[in-house]
Structure formats: structure tokens, C-alpha cells
């Protein structure tokens, strides 16, 4: 009788019984899928939702369901989501932070205590009602923004169990030792508090078993992240370390109403000099909010939003931004005051970017430099940080399949094929580009960089070199005009 095996489970050099042996080989794929380059992590405040836990979402509708309405606060996470989404961002991970003095709203229905599932002022709008039905009782929970839910049961124990089984329930029901009969009634929860304004330390959080703040974004695959409204320079180095470790481009900002001289001095004193952090000048922007009207907000979400919407080889330089109606520099009435070349030069030389109007392309709001905070010209572009992180994350996410395989020429060939295939796809999609007819990448993985002395110890090495495309930052047009100018045409006549 013939036997069927999965390939690799049968030692075909030790067969003793004459028979038919069928080995099923799994389809081999040498492809490598790119990592996400658009996910934006936001750490901010909110009036509802879990604290210290990253919540994935696609836009404002998801945010409203998870964290409630936007608040009139510069640290509000919903404000950042709204601004970034308007620039084209569509993938978020939001972490709510508090100062620890937040309180959940509560109320009672007779002897039954009802408490909001999360802390915050949004819980004050939750209405809980109990009514009799033909089969028992109905417990109705509703909120104008957070939604509603209905539960049914024959008594309070059944109703409480139904609420407990709902992972998205807006309330928790606490029963006394002696559970009373159900009595129809209604209550609006009250007493919910957001607490005070969290400190920069609260926003950074703790990198422990239970992570909080910025560290809650660890492992979430965020290509870009920001601590919304935080301008404390003591957090810059921590953001840089996190960004380097996670492959995340951190967007920081200076305080509102900052000056060029102070911004340069503060950055120098903080020691920030890293391609992992983009530092925006503290010229905060006037934003036209659909709920709270005109608000003065940090430039972080604008820069992060446009970067999230762009392919990783792109720069934020000169890309039009939406929703801005003015800035501290220019005022609300239009671009009445603009930056001088000297001011821009001072900021850019110090590794500080700014959003202003006009931009090189015309009278619109845009990021003016497209640089990170590094002082090294070879690594200070948005495109360097984002494309390097993208390629590294893609390799980290797919090349691990080769660990544990036997080291031989076939393995070297498969590794090369996978890497070359991935880089070729970047070339075909315009993320990489041919210059002077030469491929912008090379891969070496053979005996030349894997001698037996190394492979015998379990090491395999692939050397990958990738040349990025430059960004046109200083466009020079040489014009010669006059009646005496001789013009040479390439051929033909008009």
C-alpha cells in the first residue's frame, strides 16, 4: 500500500520496504510582502475609552465609538485623528493617557449600582433604563455619541450577566449581596471626570509588563507616531530612543509662541540629533474645527498626517496641507507675516522644520523643509527615515522564515531571490529609481560573505545595499535672456 508524507518528514535515505512513497511539497514562495508605512500612532487625552491600551481605527467614526467626542484641548487625541485624516491618513493606533485622577461616571437604579465602563466626562451622558417586557425585563443603555445597547433577562442577575458578556458594553452593573427584584426606572450617569492635564511623563509612560503612554505603541507597527500637544524638551531623547528601537518616525513640536532663537537653544540643550525624530517649530496653527470652532493646535498632526498619506520615498516638503486658517506667525487674517530666508535658514540648519505659507509651489500651507532633527546631511531627510524604516520592517517581518533551514547553496539562492524580488518590486512601483541606467540595489549572499568558518557556527549573512532617490530641495534654473542671446535648438524649426 502506498504511503503519503509531508515533504521533510520522511528520511528517504533509510527506506527498507519496497513501496510507493508520495511526498507532498508545500508551494514554495520566495516573495516578501512590504510592511505598512502609513500607520499613525497617537498618544493623547480623551473623555472616554481604555487608558494605556492601543486601539486600532481607520478614522473619526471609529474614534467616536471608542473614545467619544472630540474635546477642546490641545492634547486631545480625537483632534489629532481628525487633522491627520484630513491630510489623507487612514490607519491609526490611539492610546489614551490620563494623570490618574480620572473618575468613572456612576448612578443607581434602586439598590443596583451602575458605573460607566471607562473613566471620563463622556460617561456623564449615558442613560440607563429598565422596563418590563413580556418575557422579563429589558435594560437599555444609550449615549448620543458612544451608541446604544439593549439587554434582556428575567432578573437582575440575568441582566448583569448579559452586560458582562458584552465586551463593548458602556456600563458595568454591581449587584448587592441580596439582589432585589427588578423595578422599572431610568438614570443618567454623573460624576465622571477626565482628571487634570497629563504631564510629559504620563505621555511617555512606562515600558514595563503593562505598558502605558508612548510605550503602549510598542509592537503595533506604527510607521509614524506623536505625543499630541506635548512640547516638553525632556521627552525628546526618550522619543528618539523609542523611534530608533521601533522603526517609528516620531513627530515632536516646540511650545506655542516660540521664537527662533529659543527653539534653536532648547533643541541644542536637549541633545536631540536623531533621524528618528522630526521636530516642528512652535509656530502653532489655527485650525477650523467642526465642533469647537477655530482652535490653536500643535503642528504635529498636520506633519504626521501628510507623511502617513505619502509613500515612504516621499518628503513632506511642499505638500499642501488642509484645514489651516492661519498661524501664530501670520495670524488669522492670512499670511500677513512670513518667514525671512534668514529665519528659515536658522531653523533648518538647527534641524527644526516648520509649517508656513507661502510654500515653494505657491500660496498654500505646507511643511517647509522636509527634514528630521539630525545634523547629518546624508540622513536628515524625511525620505531617509521613512524608507529605511520601511525596508527594515519589511525584512524583519518576512526573512525570519529562513531561520532553521540547512545552510547550502540553495539557501543562499533562495535568500538572494527573495531580497532581489522585494527590491525589484520597490523599483517597479517607483519607490526606488534607476539612475544612469544602473540598478539602485545589490544583494550578496553566497560563499564570499559566508565562509565555512561562519556557517559552521550557524551564521548566515546577506549584504544588501540600496540607493535611495534624492529629493529636489534646491531647484536652480539658469536663465539667460536678451536680444543678443544665441539659442541653439535640438533640431528642426518652429
Language model segments and positions:
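A glycine- and small-residue-enriched flexible loop/hinge signal that marks low-structured segments
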Residues: 1-415, 422-449, 455, 494
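C-terminal edge-of-domain segments
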Residues: 447-494
Amino acid at each position: 500500500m502506498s504511503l503519503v508524507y509531508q515533504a521533510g518528514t520522511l528520511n528517504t535515505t533509510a527506506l527498507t520496504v519496497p513501496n510507493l512513497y508520495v511526498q507532498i511539497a508545500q508551494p514554495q514562495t520566495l516573495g516578501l510582502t512590504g510592511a505598512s508605512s502609513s500607520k499613525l500612532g497617537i498618544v493623547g487625552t480623551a473623555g472616554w475609552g481604555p487608558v494605556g491600551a492601543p486601539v486600532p481605527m481607520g478614522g473619526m467614526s471609529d474614534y467616536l465609538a471608542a473614545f467619544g467626542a472630540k474635546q477642546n484641548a490641545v492634547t486631545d487625541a480625537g483632534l489629532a485623528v481628525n487633522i491627520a485624516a484630513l491630510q489623507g491618513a487612514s490607519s491609526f493606533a490611539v492610546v489614551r493617557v490620563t494623570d490618574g485622577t480620572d473618575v468613572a461616571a456612576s448612578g443607581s437604579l434602586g439598590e443596583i449600582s451602575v458605573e460607566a465602563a471607562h473613566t471620563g466626562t463622556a460617561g456623564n451622558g449615558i442613560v440607563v433604563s429598565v422596563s418590563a417586557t413580556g418575557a422579563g425585563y429589558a435594560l437599555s443603555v444609550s449615549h448620543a455619541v458612544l451608541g446604544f445597547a439593549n439587554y434582556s433577562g428575567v432578573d437582575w442577575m440575568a441582566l448583569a450577566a448579559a452586560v458582562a458578556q458584552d465586551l463593548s458594553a458602556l456600563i458595568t452593573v454591581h449587584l448587592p449581596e441580596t439582589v432585589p427584584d427588578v423595578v422599572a426606572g431610568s438614570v443618567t450617569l454623573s460624576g465622571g471626570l477626565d482628571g487634570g492635564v497629563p504631564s510629559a511623563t504620563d505621555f511617555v509612560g512606562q515600558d514595563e509588563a503593562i505598558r502605558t503612554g508612548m510605550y503602549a505603541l510598542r509592537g503595533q507597527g506604527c510607521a509614524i507616531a506623536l505625543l499630541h500637544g506635548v512640547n516638553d524638551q525632556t521627552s525628546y531623547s526618550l522619543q528618539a530612543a523609542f523611534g530608533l528601537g521601533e522603526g517609528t518616525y516620531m513627530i515632536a513640536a516646540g511650545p506655542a509662541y516660540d521664537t527662533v532663537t529659543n527653539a534653536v537653544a532648547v533643541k541644542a540643550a536637549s541633545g536631540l540629533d536623531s533621524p528618528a525624530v522630526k521636530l516642528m517649530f512652535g509656530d502653532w496653527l489655527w485650525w477650523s474645527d467642526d465642533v469647537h470652532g477655530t482652535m490653536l493646535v500643535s503642528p504635529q498632526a498636520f506633519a504626521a498626517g501628510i507623511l502617513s498619506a505619502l509613500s515612504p520615498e516621499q518628503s513632506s516638503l511642499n505638500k499642501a496641507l488642509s484645514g489651516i486658517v492661519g498661524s501664530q506667525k501670520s495670524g488669522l487674517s492670512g499670511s500677513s507675516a512670513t518667514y525671512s530666508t534668514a529665519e528659515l535658514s536658522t531653523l533648518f540648519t538647527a534641524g527644526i522644520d516648520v509649517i508656513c505659507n507661502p510654500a515653494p509651489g505657491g500660496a498654500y500651507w505646507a511643511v517647509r523643509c522636509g527634514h528630521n532633527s539630525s545634523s547629518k546631511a546624508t540622513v536628515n531627510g524625511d525620505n531617509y527615515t521613512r524608507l529605511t524604516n520601511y525596508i527594515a520592517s519589511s525584512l524583519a517581518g518576512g526573512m525570519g522564515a529562513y531561520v532553521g533551514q540547512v545552510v547550502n547553496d540553495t539557501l543562499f539562492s533562495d535568500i538572494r531571490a527573495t531580497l532581489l524580488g522585494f527590491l525589484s518590486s520597490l523599483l517597479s512601483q517607483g519607490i526606488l529609481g534607476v539612475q544612469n541606467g544602473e540598478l539602485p540595489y545589490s544583494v550578496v549572499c553566497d560563499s564570499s560573505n559566508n565562509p565555512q568558518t561562519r556557517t559552521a557556527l550557524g551564521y548566515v549573512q546577506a549584504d544588501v545595499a540600496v540607493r535611495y532617490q534624492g529629493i529636489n530641495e534646491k531647484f536652480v534654473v539658469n536663465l539667460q535672456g536678451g536680444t543678443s542671446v544665441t539659442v541653439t535648438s535640438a533640431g528642426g524649426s518652429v
